A protein has these predicted regions:
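Terminal targeting signals and extreme-terminal segments of soluble enzymes
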Residues: 1-156
Length: 156
């Protein structure tokens, strides 16, 4: 008997994303200290998919119109993690086991649209990607990540 593929957020994840999107939500120190603002940037979330809009104001540039690659990788890890989180069952959580970020062109200023998608979800692993699009619609970067999926209690 095959298991039906779920297409909605689990109850746990509905609650998680509600807190994440609230202005007074308690963000983990790593996210807060990096200046990632999901309450402002997360525009859409559904099973296996997130859309972020990051207002690139130049504050993370190493040169004019060149964002520091480490910042892109950190933001990418957050976004692919949120993409994977959207596909978790109640009681599950995740950790990154591999992250690859490729920059195709310098990241311009303005709104950067980032689309995260679930590529594959197994019982204990998942694979996710995120594409960074510049305001002109050109693909500027792509991140891909493998995620270990465990019961949340295993992380305690």
């Amino acid at each position: 008997m095959s298991k039906t593929q779920r297409t909605e957020l689990s109850k746990q994840q509905e609650k998680f994303f509600k807190v994440l999107r609230s202005e007074d939500g308690q963000l983990p120190p790593g996210i807060r200290n990096l200046g990632i603002k999901p309450h402002l940037w997360l525009k859409e979330v559904s099973y296996g998919r997130v859309i972020y809009e990051w207002p690139n104001d130049g504050s993370r540039d190493i040169e004019d119109e060149r964002v520091f690659g480490g910042w892109i990788a950190a933001l990418a890890d957050h976004i692919v993690s949120m993409t994977m989180a959207s596909a978790l069952e109640d009681g599950e959580w995740l950790t990154t086991t591999e992250l690859t970020t490729r920059m195709f062109r310098p990241m311009q200023g303005g709104i950067i649209r980032i689309e995260g998608r679930l590529v594959n979800r197994g019982r204990t692993t998942g694979f996710v990607e995120a594409d960074f699009f510049q305001k002109n619609g050109k693909l500027a970067a792509r991140a891909s990540a493998a995620k270990a999926i465990r019961m949340r209690s295993d992380f305690s």
